Amino acid sequence: MMPRLQQHKIILRQLGLQPYAPVSQAMHNFTEFRTDTTPDEIWLVEHQHVFTQGQAGKAEHVLMPGDIPVIQSDRGGQITYHGPGQQVMYVMVDLKRAKIGVRQLVTAIENTVIETLAHFNIDSHARPDAPGVYVEQQKICSLGLRIRRGCSFHGLALNIAMDLEPFQRINPCGYAGMQMTQVSALQPGVTVADVQPVLVREFTRQLGYPTAKLQPWSLSDYLLSSHSSSSVL
């Protein structure tokens, strides 16, 4: 049973289209410098074209990246692709304060996506052998987290209305021949803007937060020189 976090507010930030590396650094800085009283946050972002290689990533799963950069990431999992038309949602949750474990958070994220897709009349499911969300045998959402000092960062990437071709240049999440799909292939005309409010609402509902409070986001707020940088994103 999930906790009720009504006494803990959660902040929503809309980042728009951003390159991966500076946003990842900002997320690391937020996590490193947050305190026991820092509100949890959700960041919604679309990334410019990039492959990210997770901690478990193997070089043989990067087939032909071509002109798309490959960046090492400290999230869980293996290689994946991010690009415009894919909704990335980073979840910065204090698990100790919420009194939940990593497995509970993963389940909440997967259920968030499943319920979001159901809103658009798309049947989907999670798999015990491969994190993420699937429509039949095709993957529609990837998931990768990292926990530091009891707080989560990184999150999910939901394919909505994007060019799926770059996934053919890798073995997605380390699975050769993994077929990818997206919301617009199953429900034509659905956009990122359509999905965003449903995704946020379902995530806050899964964990019992009150309504997420939208606040402005500025990259410079997170990349101050006093914040130490990390070479692993």
Swiss-Prot record:
GO biological process: protein modification process
Active site: C173 (acyl-thioester intermediate)
Domain BPL/LPL catalytic as annotated: residue spans: 36-211
SUPFAM superfamilies, per database record: Class II aaRS and biotin synthetases (SSF55681)
Enzyme Commission (EC) number: 2.3.1.181
Principal subcellular localization: cytoplasm
GO CC annotation: cytoplasm
Subcellular location: Cytoplasm
Protein task: Catalyzes the transfer of endogenously produced octanoic acid from octanoyl-acyl-carrier-protein onto the lipoyl domains of lipoate-dependent enzymes. Lipoyl-ACP can also act as a substrate although octanoyl-ACP is likely to be the physiological substrate.
Miscellaneous notes: In the reaction, the free carboxyl group of octanoic acid is attached via an amide linkage to the epsilon-amino group of a specific lysine residue of lipoyl domains of lipoate-dependent enzymes.
Name used for this protein in its record: Octanoyltransferase
Gene coding for it: lipB
